[in-house]
Amino acid sequence: GAGSRTTSFLVDDDVLIDAGTGVGELPLARLARIDHVFITHAHLDHIACLPLLVDSVGDLRPTPVTVYATDATLAVLRAHIFNWAVWPDFTRIPSPESAFMRFCPVVVGEPVELPGGRSITPLPAYHTVPAVGYHLAGTGGSLVFSGDTTSHPPFWQAVNSIPDLTHLIVETAFGDEEIALARASRHLCPSLLAEELARLNKRPQLWITHLKPGQFELIMEQVGRLAAAYSPRLLTHGQVLEF
């Protein structure tokens, strides 16, 4: 989104949704409080800071950082990131019995229960690699993040089943001038987003994220015109949402 950082959302003090370059804004003391990292998919803009995060805080924590993702995404992280060639395998450092990181597979539709009565549920998404969105259930409402996706009816079916949806964060990577590229790369553009929103049977606050650098104004003008009924707003760096 605006601010030229890649995707990462801090939830309370202890949960991270994706680990893009936005993580680098947090001081070490706050990084050390992150217990849970939920990854939508394995593309670099969503995992760039994960290796550095675990390396930085591993010996500052009494327990490992738990990384949640689908089996397919965890397999990519094992094979291509934490493989000793690109980065050490922190699921085995300093030992397999007392590692700095552990992997936990997630399944679409199955909630992960967290302390404090919170839960996070993977949602179906459709991208060039296996991907999910996430539904975050809080005490006063819910938030949904689409992750990277293109048109995908199962995502909207899942969203429509959430009774207390407060915030909906959806990617819109390209302007309509690049609709062919949006389709090929399995992202959304404003006209595709408008078609998808027609499937939505509720009116949460709509936030737009994952915009192509240099095209924020163009994309938001198009989104504002094509999806005006949803009062879309640009999600900006450092913004705080309550639910």
What are these regions (language model features)?
Residues 54-55, 60-71, 104:
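Glycine/small-residue-rich loop that forms an oxyanion/phosphate-binding "nest" at active or ligand-binding sites
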Residues 72-131, 139, 229-242:
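Metallo-beta-lactamase
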Residues 152-242:
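Cap/insert and terminal regions of metallo-dependent hydrolase folds
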Residues 52-55, 79, 195:
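Short, well-ordered alpha-helices that flank and scaffold nucleotide-derived cofactor binding pockets
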Residues 31, 114-115, 138-140, 161-163, ...:
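Glycine-rich phosphate-binding loop signature in dinucleotide/nucleotide-binding domains
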